[in-house]
């Protein structure tokens, strides 16, 4: 869950620009990894994932952005527990897609309404279930990239989802090959994808942008260090940042990098 922790810290810590960190209230639920997180308004939501006793979770908690306090919110419906899902937000509604539970790779999509504190089912992805897919949002649509499928192979598929029509559309495949556990975000009119693993478990350091207007991917300067997975990628004040992750030696990383778009280069923070 490194990218969730990174997002929480940077969302609430005004001293980030001095390159310092602040400790926040600990997560009140059971310890877990492979969870999802998203931000609605000023509040941060964290849920799903895998517990220390290898049980998929469906509970969710909200951190109040004003006072930093946690409280439980509606869990996903019974039987919908999962790990390695992907989450995104469109028009103050959160969505949780896919993942893995009890040997099954999932292709379902769930919508969370924070006003009603209610989960509702959306149309399933019209393709194989997958875990560890990446997602970003552009122009009111979500884009789901890659993921690991039941045959243990990663995927290069890209799908867009329109919540207005509750419909899925295939897009140009990811040119970096089959990938899962990548990091993704959007900034202005482009989506971005960094890191991940392929079906041979090779760790990747490639970096791409995606333009939805022409349905086209463009290679950007690769990350200047060995590849990783489980990392964070986010946009803040017109800049892109990447943090944390896991490398090929199974080591957890704590570094923070900035992508300088003007000079097309990576800078350690």
Where are the regions that the model predicts?
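Kelch-like beta-propeller repeat domains
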Residues: 18-269
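N-terminal signal peptide c-region/cleavage motif recognized by signal peptidases
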Residues: 13-14
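Sec-dependent signal peptide recognition
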Residues: 1-10
